[in-house]
């Protein structure tokens, strides 16, 4: 809920002190009721938008992802949906911790955006489903080069998040629940692609069903 302070004190120091207290807006008396109404309305709209954005990556979340897919279907466009997620990411978190894991998530988001926009500067949508799951919606049915570029860039740079020893070995070691040491390859990225030819899908549920299948195949 946005906090708005209405005060008759016009001193600049007072206004600054108020805004330091996590207050969203300061209004000096006398107050125009119409101005106050639209201030509250606009602040509420911005807060609702921010709630739909991943605080970690700054990418739109599921609400906007679903809206984008519905729009593509309604407009009868040709498009593809790239489902991207990380392999062996849980093992990485277990060894390096969640803060380092967050760094890889942000790196993944940046890599996807850079690679997708290098091929499709406009009209490409990139979203963060949650955790290490991402989606890219692109206006083309041929995504091979985009996917290859994402994987190549990811693999070339992800090693900076590992120790030299782990990079040299090519794997990390994690104790399972029974205390047995297991080896996991360095974190990589998998991409499953759903080609949505014009009229192929009637709704986003159908896309989701095929998406689950291609994600499974990509990780196999």
Can you say where each PLM-predicted feature lies in the sequence?
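Alpha4 helix (beta4-alpha4-beta5 surface) of REC/receiver domains from two-component response regulators
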Residues: 9-25
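Amphipathic HAMP/coiled-coil signal-transducing linker helices
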Residues: 15, 43-62, 85
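Conserved helix-loop-beta segment at the catalytic/binding core of cyclic-nucleotide signaling proteins
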Residues: 110-146, 152, 156-164, 169-170
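C-terminal output helix
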Residues: 13, 31-40
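A short glycine-enriched loop-to-beta-strand structural element that forms part of the catalytic core
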Residues: 128, 162-213
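Receiver (REC) domain switch/output surface
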Residues: 36-47, 68, 72
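Conserved long alpha-helical elements within nucleotide-processing catalytic cores of c-di-GMP signaling
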Residues: 61-80, 90-114, 127-131, 135, ...
């Amino acid at each position: 809920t946005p906090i708005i302070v209405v005060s008759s004190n016009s001193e600049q120091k007072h206004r600054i002190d108020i805004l330091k207290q996590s207050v969203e807006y300061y209004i000096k008396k006398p107050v125009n009721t119409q101005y106050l109404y639209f201030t509250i309305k606009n602040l509420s709209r911005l807060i609702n938008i921010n709630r739909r954005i991943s605080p970690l990556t700054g990418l739109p979340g599921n609400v906007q992802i679903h809206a984008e897919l519905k729009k593509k279907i309604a407009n009868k466009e040709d498009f593809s949906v790239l489902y991207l997620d990380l392999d062996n990411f849980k093992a990485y978190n277990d060894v390096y911790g969640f803060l380092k894991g967050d760094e890889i998530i942000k790196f993944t988001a940046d890599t996807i955006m850079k690679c997708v926009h290098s091929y499709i500067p406009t009209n490409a949508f990139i979203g963060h489903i949650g955790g290490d799951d991402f989606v890219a919606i692109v206006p083309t049915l041929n995504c091979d080069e985009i996917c290859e570029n994402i994987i190549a860039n990811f693999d070339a740079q992800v090693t900076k998040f590992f120790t030299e020893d782990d990079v040299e070995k090519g794997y990390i070691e994690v104790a399972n629940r029974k205390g047995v040491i297991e080896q996991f390859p360095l974190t990589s990225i998998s991409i499953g692609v759903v080609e949505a030819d014009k009229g192929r899908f009637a709704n986003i549920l159908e896309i989701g069903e095929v998406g689950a299948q291609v994600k499974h195949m990509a990780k196999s």
